[in-house]
A protein has these predicted regions:
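Conserved N-terminal alpha-helix of the aminotransferase class I/II PLP-enzyme fold
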Residues: 13-61, 83-88, 94
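Conserved core of the PLP fold type I
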Residues: 54-73, 103-110
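Conserved PLP-anchoring active-site segment centered on the Schiff-base-forming lysine
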Residues: 71-89, 118
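Conserved C-terminal alpha-helix-loop-beta "cap" of PLP-dependent enzymes
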Residues: 74-76, 267, 272-340
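PLP-dependent aminotransferase-class I/II
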Residues: 99-137, 141-144, 151-158
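Active-site C-terminal subdomain of aminotransferase-like
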Residues: 108, 135, 142, 150, ...
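Catalytic PLP-binding core of fold-type I/II PLP enzymes
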Residues: 151-183
Length: 340
């Protein structure tokens, strides 16, 4: 069986496992107060060009999204997000569970536009009864998006400008950030993201770590943020496990280097799909590739390949997703191409 169902099929990069083994018997303080967490935080600040950033390590993406959004918003506020965004569709109502509504915006290939934020906010405040409604309190985007697409630097700057105008904190979900940063089609750097956002996170779970996400508040974290992390069940007692992983990922540019494999394998698959005449659902420059398959072909392929159902295309076709990762082997791509 070939596995292309997600980008976390593998365990962790061998360098991380080796470092965890080497440090296993060290006696260290808990909850992210150890020397490895401190070292990882400094390396992340340096990589972001943001020396005063507040950095925290959380265990997973959904906990991270819910904790950040819940910590930033007032009780009467909601978060603006693409109607196709992860927090809108694939987190089992985790944001609503914190007491905050997801306020959806129209999306084009997974991306929202600055104009959509402006339209929403001005329409909201133009309604004389807005005190009876959920206030827009922050903006959520992801990079790459749920569809593997990327914001350009110009688009990111425009969204940032609108967010500042209306005093809406901008939160960027970076679960797959490594893959976005190394795409040959991007002009966005980690420093650009730190400059344009109020908070973002660097994904580890999908980019080489066993688990974990590094949250970066570019200015200042909400007061008592760590306590709120604890309330959300996202604080790891053995915080060293996250610190060691991110310290390793941000040593010798490992995070960037291993991310390139996902792009190289995905682009080879993309070229093969195009050469074989398959219809791409959209043009993704990252590790997620979406293709329209005849239902008969989907059933046939599913006997030997694990892939992700995305959506119904029509009565005879389905959109599926192939996802590559830092650990995808080129020979598995070749085997998949043969089956196609």
């Amino acid at each position: 069986m070939l596995f292309f169902v997600n980008d976390y099929c593998e365990g962790a990069h061998p360098a991380i496992l080796q470092k965890l083994l080497e440090t296993n018997m060290e006696k260290l303080s808990g909850y992210g107060t150890d020397k490895y967490c401190d070292s990882a935080k400094e390396k992340i600040r340096k990589a972001c060009g943001c020396p005063d950033a507040d950095v925290f390590f959380l265990v997973g993406g959904t906990q991270t999204n819910a904790t950040i959004i819940g910590s930033v918003l007032n009780r009467y506020e909601g978060v603006l997000a693409a109607q196709t965004g992860h927090v809108s569709c694939h987190e089992a109502g985790a944001i609503e569970y914190t007491g905050h509504k997801v306020l959806t915006l129209p999306a084009e290939n997974g991306k929202i536009k600055a104009e959509s934020i402006t339209d929403y906010v001005e329409t909201f405040y133009g309604d004389e009864s807005h005190d009876h409604m959920v206030f827009p309190g922050m903006v959520y985007i992801s990079h790459p998006t749920e569809y593997g697409t990327l914001y350009t630097k110009k688009e990111l700057e425009e969204i940032s400008e609108v967010c500042h105008k209306y005093e809406l904190p901008l939160f960027l979900d970076g679960a797959r950030l490594g893959y976005g940063l190394v795409s040959p089609e991007t002009d966005v750097t980690l420093e650009d993201i730190a400059r344009c956002t109020d908070v973002f996170y660097i994904g580890g779970t999908k980019v080489g770590a066993l688990c974990g996400e590094a949250v970066v508040f570019t200015k200042k974290a909400p007061k008592h943020f760590m306590t709120m992390v604890k309330q959300q069940g996202a604080l790891l007692a053995k915080g060293r496990l996250l610190g060691i992983q991110f310290d390793t990922l941000f040593t010798d540019d490992l995070y960037t280097r291993i991310s390139k494999n996902a792009i190289e394998t995905a682009m080879k698959l993309k070229r093969a799909l195009q050469e074989k005449g398959y219809q791409l659902f959209l043009d993704s420059p990252t590790n997620q590739q979406f293709v329209v398959l005849e239902n008969k072909k989907k059933e046939e392929l599913g006997k030997e390949v694990q892939f992700d159902f995305w959506e119904k295309y029509d009565e005879d076709h389905t959109v599926i997703r192939f996802a590559t990762s830092w650990g995808t082997k080129m020979e598995d791509i070749d085997a998949l191409i043969e089956l196609l």
